[in-house]
């Protein structure tokens, strides 16, 4: 099972969190550090990928419109995560709107092969994401604190260095509560994106969430 992750920020942390969660379901191969290009991933795969790996989690960097499309042809992701669209690297892209076009190439590639993409509700401010969700509503899940999110972060409280988090799946009418140990308000969203994706990949992970979140590495 192949999972691609992109976004203006948060993708490395989400990658590590998701890999840790999926480990309870099977061996995970994921790109170390911030390796996110075809060349870097190719070298990494040749050095470390083994036949026994069940999951491949790939960080996918955008260096221009079309770069994630090329990465997607290489990785062939079954699932995808878009963490955010921000104004980093606008000098490279020309505008935030062009960044959104580039990042949306991942969910477009995923839904084209019948897969599922989990995206931050924040990116729905950009037309490419609204378009792909309108065309494939059953293959896109939005996550965030916003009322309109498909999976809403309903509760997040930090107690003694541990977040108590409740996610509300507004479409299914279900809730999931779990604990998460990484400090920083931004890691609430990072953990929510990883959790929703992990449940899409293997719903049984929900039964083991308290066990899989405590050993996640603190990523800057």
Provide a role label for each language-model segment.
Residues 1-117, 121, 131-135:
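Phosphate-binding loop of NTP-binding sites
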Residues 82-220:
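Acidic, Mg2+-coordinating active-site environments of NTP-dependent enzymes
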């Amino acid at each position: 099972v192949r999972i691609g992750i992109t976004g203006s920020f948060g993708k490395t942390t989400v990658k590590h969190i998701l890999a840790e969660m999926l480990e309870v379901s099977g061996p995970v191969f994921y790109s170390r550090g911030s390796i996110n290009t075809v060349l870097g991933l190719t070298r990494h795969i040749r050095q470390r990928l083994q036949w026994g790996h069940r999951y491949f989690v790939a960080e996918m960097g955008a260096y221009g419109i079309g770069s994630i499309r090329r990465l997607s042809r290489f990785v062939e992701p079954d699932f995808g995560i878009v963490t955010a669209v921000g104004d980093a690297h606008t000098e490279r892209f020309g505008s935030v709107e062009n960044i959104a076009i580039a990042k949306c190439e991942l969910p477009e590639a995923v839904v084209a092969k019948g897969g599922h993409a989990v995206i931050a509700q924040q990116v729905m401010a950009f037309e490419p994401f609204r378009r792909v969700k309108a065309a494939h509503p059953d293959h896109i899940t939005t996550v965030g604190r916003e009322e309109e999110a498909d999976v809403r972060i309903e509760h997040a409280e930090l107690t003694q260095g541990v977040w108590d988090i409740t996610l509300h799946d507004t479409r299914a009418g279900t809730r999931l509560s779990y604990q998460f140990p990484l400090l920083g308000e931004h890691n609430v969203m990072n953990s929510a994106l990883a959790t929703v994706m992990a449940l899409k990949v293997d719903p049984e992970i929900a039964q083991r969430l308290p066990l899989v979140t405590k050993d996640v590495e603190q990523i800057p």
